[in-house]
Structures are given as structure tokens and as C-alpha cells.
Curated annotation (Swiss-Prot):
Gene it is expressed from: SLC35F3
Cell compartments where the protein resides: Membrane
GO biological process: thiamine transport
Membrane topology: Multi-pass membrane protein
Keywords: Membrane, Transmembrane, Transmembrane helix, Transport
Function: Mediates thiamine transport.
UniProt-annotated stretches for the region Disordered: 25-45, 393-421
Membrane-spanning ranges: 66-86, 98-118, 149-169, 179-199, 208-228, 232-252, 266-286, 305-325, 326-346, 352-372
Protein name per Swiss-Prot or TrEMBL: Solute carrier family 35 member F3
InterPro entries in the cross-refs: EamA_dom, Solute_c_fam_35_mem_F3/F4
Predominant localisation class: membrane
Amino acid sequence: MKKHSARVAPLSACNSPVLTLTKVEGEERPRDSPGPAEAQAPAGVEAGGRASRRCWTCSRAQLKKIFWGVAVVLCVCSSWAGSTQLAKLTFRKFDAPFTLTWFATNWNFLFFPLYYVGHVCKSTEKQSVKQRYRECCRFFGDNGLTLKVFFTKAAPFGVLWTLTNYLYLHAIKKINTTDVSVLFCCNKAFVFLLSWIVLRDRFMGVRIVAAILAIAGIVMMTYADGFHSHSVIGIALVVASASMSALYKVLFKLLLGSAKFGEAALFLSILGVFNILFITCIPIILYFTKVEYWSSFDDIPWGNLCGFSVLLLTFNIVLNFGIAVTYPTLMSLGIVLSIPVNAVIDHYTSQIVFNGVRVIAIIIIGLGFLLLLLPEEWDVWLIKLLTRLKVRKKEEPAEGAADLSSGPQSKNRRARPSFAR
């Protein structure tokens, strides 16, 4: 099995969270080798002190990552659930899902400026915008961002990004947000299947089981409301959105690999530029053909549109750059936790019926998503854990028998001197 460096090689498409482009930076430094004095030091109190300090430092670093992980999970959950609910609310006054998609995608332009502000505030070696831009452009090749690269390596992802968001928003019009958020979690299963076929990722039986659970959950979700036209169309739209998202992710790994934070920020900003230059004509056509029509611009709920765009931008920022402070698995949990949040909101704001079939479908899809979060070496870790437990169980009876056998002997030894007197 191939083991990759965190900086040099791309993450497995299935191991990284949904739509994550970035890889871990700053972990390539080798551990400091012990000096001659440390090598000759006796394994005594000093060595034990150093080991305890290392363990304490390690535990503190892990606790810090877990703390940040909880914060990131809450941010991912709230931004994803909030954007979904706000989109549902927006469609009551503004029935234009593609226009909403176009408007929100334009905000992607802010990725690189926000990244550069963070770079100036945090980095010790500050670079100008031009220098940083040129350095990030190396991600696209030796020639940087040329017109050919723009149309061959950026434009297809811009189309997939737009389709993913449009299909998701259009599905919100047809079915409730709980079903939409649950079905979109099948994205992870589609990523595994595509990465197994296209990227030749390692075959894992548990992930095949997870993919089967996801497909079974989709079928059960369709059956939950009966085979009505709106329900079937809505479910088909969400599944198509999850498929576009999976295709986007796997193609990115195949064509571009993994990006550093600056490179990912530049790439996402380029998607925003592509959206402004080439997708703007579509909302205009939809408006004049009255497919997505509004009487006047004063009737547009600008607050809802801007709120949705900010929440979606926050979600993508945290999901793509949260890997700097915590584990990717914890970030993925935020998407799963948005399901009960949407369910509670739907329970009080809509006429959703949580019958047995729907609840089982939600549980099955959620279980499949969680199984896909298992690391590739999970079976090795499980075997080691079971082996340790067996060894401990064998040692405990042996220690108990040793204590029983040593008890009478010690009493006899203590009694002999007093008996001699």
C-alpha cells in the first residue's frame, strides 16, 4: 500500500471532506534527531521526564486540534443548515434558483483577497499581491494561468460547481430540506465509487457496504412519500447534485491533484470570475423568457440573497481551509449533524411526516456516510486493539494466580522465626 506525504502527494479523494481541495501544509519538517548527549544519556529520570514532556506536548496539541475541530464542526453544521433553510425561505418570495446560484457563486471571487489578508496578517515573509499571485499560479503548470489552462482546467469545474449548486437549490423547491440534506450525503459514496474506478483507489469492503447503504437509503426515501411526481423529481435532482459534486472532486484529484491554501483560494476565485464572465448570460435569458421572472428589482429579497451567499461562502471557506487547524474527519461530521438540525426546523415550520420508512432511510444513509469516514487502516487498528485486550485478559488471571500462590508462602516465612523460639 502506498503511503503519501501530507504535502507532496494528494489526499485520497474519499478520505477528504466533501468538495475539499486543500492539503495539509507545514507537516513536512522532519523530527529533530537526538544529539550525542541525548543518545548517551542513561534511561533514567531525565529520559522519563523528556518522554513525559513529549507526551504532554502531544496531548496538548491533540486537545487543541479536537477543540478547533468542535468549533469547525459547529461552523460547518450551522452554515450548511442555515444556507439550506434560508434558500427555502427565499424561494417563497423569489422563485429563481439559477439566479440565486449565479449570485452566490459570484462571491467566490472573494476567496483569494481574503486569503491574502490572512497571509499578510499571519506570515512572517510577506509578499506583494502580484508575487503571491504568481506563486499560486504555478499550481496550473510552468506557464501559469494561461487562456488555454483557464478553459481546459478551470472552466469545466466552473460548470460542475454551478450544476451542483443549481440542482441542490432546485431540489429544495420540490422536497423538504431534511430529505435534501440527507440525500446529498450520498455524495461521499459516489466519490468512493468514482475514485475506485477512475483514480484506482484502494478497494475497501466496508466502503462498498456504505455505498450499498446509500443506494438503499435513496430507494427508501423515494418510497417514504410515495411515488409522486414532485417527490421523485426532487430526489432525482438531489442525487444528480451529489453526483456532480462527486465528479467535481474526483476530476480535481485526477487533473490537478491537491492544492495548497493559496492555490485553492486562487482556483475558487477563478471559478467566481468564470461565473461572472460566462454564466451571467443565462440568468438574463431566463429572465426575458420568463422562466425565472420577477416584476421589479425592488421585490427581490436582497437580504436573503446576501445572507445565503455569506453562509455558503463561510461553509466553503471552513470546509476547504479548516484542515489547517483540525482533522478532515471532524469537518465531515458537520455535514451529518446538519441533518437533525434541518429535521427539527422542518418539524416546526413545515408539514413533514417522519414515518418509519423515512427515519430508517435517514439512519441508513447517515450510517453509510459514517462508514466512509473510517480510515484505510481501520482494520489494522481494530486487530491491534483486540489483540491488546486479549493479552490483558490473559495477564489478569495469571497475576491473580500468582498472588494466591505467593500468599501462603509469605505467611509461612513470617511464621517460622516465631515458631523456632
